[in-house]
Swiss-Prot record:
Pfam families: DEAD (PF00270), Helicase_C (PF00271), HTH_61 (PF20470), POLQ_helical (PF21099). One of its GO terms (biological process) is double-strand break repair via synthesis-dependent strand annealing. ATP binds at L191, P192, T193, G194, A195, G196, K197, T198. It comes from the Eukaryota. It catalyses: Couples ATP hydrolysis with the unwinding of duplex DNA by translocating in the 3'-5' direction; ATP + H2O = ADP + phosphate + H(+). Coiled coil: none annotated. Residues 178-349 form the Helicase ATP-binding domain. The keyword Cell division does not apply. Belongs to the helicase family. SKI2 subfamily. The keyword Ligase does not apply. Residues 43-55 have a biased composition (Low complexity). This is Helicase POLQ-like. Residues 1-84 are annotated as: Disordered.
Length: 923
């Protein structure tokens, strides 16, 4: 075997740049072979000449949509392409990290070596194998792939222009040309993270809105993702003449506004989507929804929220006439979901950007093979910063930044902050100062727009150095600031908790998992894949890698087992009496079911029915019905002939109930408020107790206590509690005494340092004291500092309290004895939500306008939402001074949405009175 000549290093080369690592002998290698991914396509051979046309997509039709086919269809799953041929071999070059991270990071990424996937070199010459792309398959000639069949040509061109797309991936063209999808059959898209599933969802929703003239619902897991998607879809409003409506947090009306001439795409969280489905069924308007798209479909097995997702899908399957499209990258038991949703499955292993997974144990790198084995890939140089950076994170960033970016997933919030500070201190000066001026201007803009005009001092210094941390302890504004700075290239490294993996999309070149833990729990297979999938996103990088740092020993053993294990099955969340009872109550109130047999019919459309035997299902349904009756949520009218013919029915531990089932006033109230029945039982008892004993009106403290959520908990500062207790008026001390919180108890707690649990009256009273400070217009930053809690936690608690107050108000609408709460709580909600001058409140309904910015606009003459909606973006930038043109356009677009909603609500009222409104125009 011929060997390539060895290049010797001359001493002159070293003297030219004393900061460069000392080069060692390295073997020259031939250029790397192409690794371009080609989508493995399913081949469908025609059975007969007459059947060959079945593969051709139908032309665009503007007729009414076909009814969904209820029968289960055989799934045609695109087979995952196996790797073909030997792996591509990479010969590592040799170098040494001189003077730790500072010297190595001095090197520019312009000299990045493709042979070195870590941005570093190994000390030995072990072979490093890289994942090889599958060989292309020949596409069947009988299959005509034309995604324009999904949308009219003009609209498809407009979509490509907005999304800046040259062409679709092969699998996207194939999927959008699938006859089953175009015929309205339900579909599950199972593809890797970053494969481009979102494009399919957007095109299908546009097809439903433009071609079939029906609304669509996009269900997303988190509020932050909904807000991000609203911004991404905003250009569709003017381009396609549709409405994009947000249903998250405190946004969204029930029932939705009846639009004139336009159809809507509702972008909603799981909870809001369920309430939206309920309101449409109540109004008899569910047929207006032609499509429900669910992102992260695997969350159907995620406990409480999974139960809500399963319920909304079951109700839509049972009574709706539209199409369901579910998307996920981690669905192990996909056949169960296929059965439950009456869907076919489209699956491929295509990923547009190559992803390589590594595990770092000590100073040795291992590559993760397809079957989960760890193959030694080489040794890293000595970690010269081991005393301050024992995990060697700085080594893994050395040649990556500032040209590329990285996300470091840490086990907890405190660890995020510590790692971010470490990296910020260790970065070379030329990297820290590279964009300091731009970062400083960016932060000044943020602070001028922020009502508190303050930011965490540590976070601010990190951002100025090109590093940041991101976790739930930050406020929403701080998190958005970090995300915006990252997208503008001012931040190179983000240290985050695991929630970011399923949250906001931050495209990075490298993902580093600092420890295989989430809090105190071990990292699961699905979580690991989700984190790793964040590396190397299409349109931003040509490749990506994930490096997990593991300790040798027990941690290494179970991590190896996790890599080789299967993803846990996605199990139904309706398997308990609590969750099944909630579903049954919804069905009864919505008049979807009036007896056991009709309830059993509704359950047939759930994942639970696909995973459990009919006998166990009936047993759970009957016990859940009995439980609802015992808690007075429903009433049962047994049929006389059945009672006479079955005298032994009462002797049964779980009786068969043959009569009509109706909701009680309490059941209607629970449904109207969107409460869980178990939660409502405790809440109802507390509300009755408060009203019977009398609400203390000397201040708003008692009302704030009533709306304090049960699930919130924090550490108690008993010394502060005693000071605040002594400062309370006698009327408020009376309330604390009724809840068992007297001065004697506080004094004992100061000594014993007792911890309070979530939901107890004492804990809720302590949280109510924080809400009272905010009610009195104290800045949130100051309140959080005084009580020793995180600003992000306090903000989340405030928002949860506002939602709780709104829900209690709806709850009170159905129970006549609670009329005082129905009258008092709406004002409380408004004041807690805005806490501003009354004249500024209308302006603050616009996204991007808070109290400080609203005051500037009001002073400049923008006194109504309509004036902002008609504003010139350039003039708006000049008036505010601290915003960019993109922000100005976003504010104007949001103002137009608010104005549109207000006008449509008035038009809806005029339509009821028979007033002609066809000639009206918004602007």
């Amino acid at each position: 075997m011929n060997r390539t000549p060895i290049r010797r290093c001359k001493s002159a080369e070293i003297e030219e740049d004393p900061f460069s690592p000392i080069p060692k002998f390295s073997r020259l290698r031939t250029p790397r072979t192409s690794r371009e991914y080609v989508c493995p396509l399913k081949s469908t051979s025609p059975q007969s000449p007459s059947s060959s046309t079945e593969n051709e997509p139908p032309p665009v039709s503007v007729t009414s949509p076909p009814a969904r086919k209820r029968a289960l269809e055989e799934s045609t799953v695109t087979p995952i392409q196996q790797k073909i041929g030997p792996p591509v071999l990479k010969r590592s070059s040799l170098s040494k990290l001189a003077d730790g991270f500072r010297t190595a990071a001095y090197l520019n990424n312009e000299s990045e070596n493709d042979d070195d996937p870590f941005g570093l070199s190994f000390r030995n010459e072990q072979v490093l194998m890289s994942k090889c792309a599958p060989a292309p398959e020949k596409r069947p000639e009988t299959l005509t792939l034309d995604p324009s069949k999904c949308l009219p040509e003009r609209d498809m061109e407009m979509y490509r222009k907005i999304k800046k797309l040259d062409k679709f991936y092969d699998w996207q063209q194939e999927c959008l040309s699938d006859k089953r999808l175009l015929d309205g059959e339900n579909c599950i898209l199972s593809l890797p993270t970053g494969a481009g599933k979102t494009l399919i969802a957007e095109v299908l929703m546009l097809r439903e809105a433009i071609v079939r003239k029906r609304n669509a619902i996009l269900v997303l897991p988190y509020v932050a993702i909904v807000q991000e998607k609203i911004s991404a879809l905003a250009p569709f409003e003017d381009a396609f003449g549709i409405n994009i409506e947000e249903y998250a947090s405190n946004k969204g009306r029930f029932p939705p506004i009846k639009r004139r001439k336009r159809v809507s795409v509702y972008v909603a969280t799981i909870e809001k989507a369920n309430m939206l489905i309920n309101s449409l069924i109540t109004q008899g308007q569910l047929d207006r929804v032609g499509m429900v798209v669910v992102d992260e479909l695997h969350m159907i097995g995620d406990g409480g929220r999974g139960a809500i997702l399963e319920q909304l899908l079951a109700k839509f399957l049972y009574k709706g006439t539209g199409q369901i499209v579910g998307m996920s990258a981690t669905l192990p038991n996909i056949d169960d979901l296929k059965f439950a949703l009456r869907a076919f499955v489209y699956s491929t292993n295509f990923r547009p950007v190559e992803l390589t997974e590594f595990v770092k144990i000590g100073q040795t790198m291992h590559q993760v093979s397809e079957n989960g084995d760890l193959n030694p890939a080489g040794d890293l140089p000595t970690n010269n910063l081991k005393s301050t950076d024992p995990d060697g994170i700085c080594q893994l960033l050395a040649k990556l930044i500032p040209k590329n970016s990285a996300v470091i997933f840490c086990p907890n919030k405190k660890n995020c902050e510590n790692v971010a500070v470490l990296i910020a201190k260790t970065l070379p000066a030329h990297i820290r100062q590279a964009k300091r001026a731009e970062s400083d201007a960016f932060l000044q803009s943020y602070l001028s727009d922020n009502d508190d005009e303050r930011m965490d001092a540590v976070l601010k210094q990190c951002i100025l150095s090109g590093v940041a941390y991101h976790h739930s302890g930050l406020t929403q504004d701080e998190r958005k600031c970090v995300e915006a700075a990252f997208m503008e290239g001012l931040i190179y490294v983000v240290c985050a908790t695991s929630t970011l993996a399923a949250g906001v999309n931050l495209p990075v070149r490298r993902v580093i998992i600092k420890a295989p833990m989430v809090g105190r729990e071990r990292l699961g297979k699905a979580q690991y894949l989700q984190m790793a999938g964040r590396a190397g996103r299409a349109g931003f990088d040509t490749k990506g890698d994930c490096i997990t740092i593991i300790k040798a020993g027990e941690e290494e053993r179970w991590f190896r087992e996790m890599l080789k294990s299967d993803i846990p099955r996605c199990m139904s969340s309706l398997s308990s009496e609590e969750s099944m009872g909630s579903f049954i109550l919804d069905c009864v109130v919505l008049k979807l079911a009036e007896n056991i047999e009709e309830i059993m019919t509704a359950v047939r459309y759930s994942l639970f029915y696909a995973q459990e035997s009919p006998e166990n299902i009936r047993k759970l349904v009957e016990s859940s019905v009995k439980r609802l009756e015992e808690h007075y949520f429903i009433t049962i009218e047994p049929l006389e002939q059945d009672v006479a013919s079955e005298p032994s029915a009462q002797a049964s531990s779980i009786p068969r109930v043959p009569g009509k089932i109706s909701p009680s006033d309490l059941g209607n109230a629970v449904f109207n408020a969107g409460f869980d029945p178990d939660e409502a039982t405790r809440l109802h008892a507390d509300l009755v107790s408060s009203l019977n004993q009398g609400v203390i009106f000397a201040s708003h403290f008692h009302l704030l206590f009533i709306i304090t959520p049960y699930e919130q908990v924090c550490n108690i500062n008993w010394d502060l509690f005693l000071l605040m207790y002594n400062a309370l008026p006698s009327s408020e001390r009376k309330l604390l005494a009724e809840c068992g919180l007297e001065e004697k108890f506080i004094l004992e707690a100061i000594i014993t340092r007792v911890d309070l649990t979530a939901g107890t009256p004492r804990m809720r009273l302590y949280i109510a004291l924080m809400l009272q400070k905010i009610w009195n217009h104290e800045p949130m930053y100051t309140v959080a500092e005084r009580f020793g809690v995180e600003k992000g936690w306090l903000q989340a608690t405030l928002q949860s309290s506002i939602s709780q107050a709104a829900s209690i108000a709806k709850f009170s609408e159905k129970i006549t004895t609670m009329w005082p709460l129905r009258k008092l709580l709406p004002e409380l909600v408004q004041r807690l939500s805005e806490a501003a001058q009354p004249e500024l409140l209308p302006l603050m309904t616009v996204d991007g306008i808070k109290k400080a910015r609203a005051a500037i606009l009001f002073k400049a003459g923008y006194k109504t939402v309509g004036m902002i909606a008609r504003a010139n973006p350039l003039k708006l930038v000049q008036e505010l001074g601290t915003i960019r043109m993109a922000q100005a356009n976003s504010i104007i677009a949001s103002a137009r949405m608010v104005l549109r909603d207000q006008v449509d609500e008035k038009m809806e009222e005029l339509d009821v009175w028979g007033v002609a409104t066809d000639s009206f125009n918004y602007f």
